[in-house]
Design a protein with these regions (language model features):
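Phosphate-binding P-loop
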Residues: 1-3
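Hydrophobic anchor at the beta1->P-loop junction of P-loop NTPases
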Residues: 6-8
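Walker A (P-loop) phosphate-binding loop of P-loop NTPases
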Residues: 13
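Conserved lysine of the Walker
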Residues: 16
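Hydrophobic positions on the alpha1 helix immediately C-terminal to the Walker A/P-loop
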Residues: 19
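Hydrophobic alpha-helical packing residues
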Residues: 23, 27-28
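ATP-dependent small-molecule kinase phosphotransfer cores
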Residues: 30-125
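AAA+/SF3 P-loop NTPase mechanochemical coupling elements
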Residues: 128-129
Length: 129
């Protein structure tokens, strides 16, 4: 039996984490196995990328293209290491952000062509969708 992948999208402070925690508790109370994750993050590489982008001086002033590719690298690892295996095992994966955030933050806000963002995202996620 395949699992389920649910993503929560929205701006900072809109309640994504609160809703994820509530749904996770409800699903677990129903006997479901739930994996909670976030982007960037969820793997050692993802957490490193998160730290680089948010806290490291090397992440300051990064070009939009470099930022997009770091998110894509993190996502590729995340899908292959955590998300796809959990779904294959019948687990429910709840993710704080995924593709839509990249489309908005790197595509729209950083003015990268949406077709390029989509192509890179699709390459990163492979057959997950």
């Amino acid at each position: 039996m395949n699992g389920l992948f649910i993503t929560f999208e929205g701006g900072e402070g809109c309640g994504k984490s609160t809703q994820i925690a509530a749904l996770k508790a409800r699903l677990e109370a129903m006997g479901k196995t739930v994996v909670q994750t976030r982007e960037p993050g969820g793997t050692a590489l993802g957490e490193y990328v998160r730290s680089l982008l948010q806290h490291d001086d090397a992440g300051q002033g990064m070009s939009p293209e470099a930022e997009l590719l770091l998110f894509a690298a993190s996502r590729a690892q995340h899908v292959r290491e955590l998300i796809a295996p959990a779904i294959a095992q019948g687990q429910i994966v709840l993710s704080d952000r995924f593709l839509d955030s990249t489309t908005v933050y790197q595509g729209v806000a950083r003015a990268i062509d949406s077709k390029k963002v989509d192509t890179i995202n699709q390459f990163a996620i492979g057959d997950i969708n």
